[in-house]
């Protein structure tokens, strides 16, 4: 998925998820 690919390219998805929480 696009999210998985973006997370691998840069720790943005993981950080975003933590911030959203």
Curated annotation (Swiss-Prot):
Database matches in Gene3D superfamilies: Histone, subunit A
One GO process term, biological-process aspect: innate immune response
One GO CC term on file: extracellular region
Modified residues (N6-(2-hydroxyisobutyryl)lysine): 21
Compartments where located: Secreted
A molecular-function term among this protein's GO annotations: lipid binding
Family recorded in the similarity comment: Belongs to the histone H2A family.
Description of its domains: Adopts a distorted helix spanning from residues Gly-7 to Pro-11 and a regular alpha-helix from Val-12 to Arg-20 in membrane mimetic environment, and a random structure in water.
Protein name from the UniProt record: Buforin-2
Organism: Sphaenorhynchus lacteus
């Amino acid at each position: 998925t696009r999210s998985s690919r973006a997370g691998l390219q840069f720790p943005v998805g993981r950080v975003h998820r933590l911030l959203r929480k």
